[in-house]
């Protein structure tokens, strides 16, 4: 006999280009919009939790610690990239950074250009610039997150969506 265990038999996989990350200094939340890093090749989010074991006569007892989160971003360096410069200055000055993880494959039920998102605050904890003779310059960033993040919906402009993936363009001038 066949039993269903809430398996999503007809689910679709989400392409990596549909998950985008947007960044903004917390100090600029009333004056500026969040931006994506140009030429992103890979992003990731990790959540981990350590635990301690205590030996008892009945076996070990585990005590979970506090969850810690990190977001990583790898991109090719764009000439004159002001966002990367701004993020590095924020690292030097211990400034809090806002980060949105947005799923462009899941539009919100209401509102134009709104998508399922997770919001975080944290600090840039590592920046690495790698250059070799054969490839483009690569920039890797690591953000240490505070708290667990909050689920919600984020607005992603048409321009930001176009940064994430090629969008079809007509042969006529824009607005014609």
Region spans (language model):
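N-terminal leader/targeting segments
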Residues: 1-12
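Solvent-exposed edge beta-strands and adjacent loop segments
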Residues: 10-76, 124-137
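Structured, beta-strand-rich domain cores
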Residues: 59-117
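Residue-level signal for secondary-structure boundary sites
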Residues: 81-83, 149-153
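Short linear functional motifs in flexible/disordered or boundary regions
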Residues: 85, 136, 154-155
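Short, low-complexity, polar/charged sequence segments that are solvent-exposed and flexible
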Residues: 90-96, 120-122, 143-145, 160-165
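Short beta-strand and beta-hairpin "edge-sheet" elements
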Residues: 102-151
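Intrinsically disordered, low-complexity terminal/linker regions enriched in Pro/Ser/Gly
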Residues: 153-176
């Amino acid at each position: 006999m066949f039993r269903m265990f809430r398996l999503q038999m007809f689910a679709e996989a989400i392409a990596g280009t549909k998950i985008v990350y947007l960044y903004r200094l917390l100090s600029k939340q009333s004056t500026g919009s969040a931006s994506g890093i140009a030429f992103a090749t890979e992003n990731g989010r990790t959540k981990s939790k350590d635990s301690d074991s205590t030996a008892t006569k009945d076996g070990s007892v585990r005590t979970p610690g506090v969850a810690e989160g990190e977001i990583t971003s790898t991109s090719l360096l764009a000439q004159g990239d002001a966002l990367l410069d701004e993020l590095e200055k924020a690292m030097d000055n211990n400034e809090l950074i806002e980060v949105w993880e947005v799923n462009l494959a899941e539009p919100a039920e209401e509102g134009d250009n709104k998508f399922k998102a997770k919001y975080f605050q944290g600090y840039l904890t590592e920046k690495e610039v790698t250059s070799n003779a054969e490839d483009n310059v690569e920039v890797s960033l690591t953000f240490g997150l505070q708290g667990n993040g909050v689920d919600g919906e984020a607005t992603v402009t048409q321009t930001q969506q176009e940064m994430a993936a090629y969008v079809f363009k007509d042969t006529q001038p824009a607005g014609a």
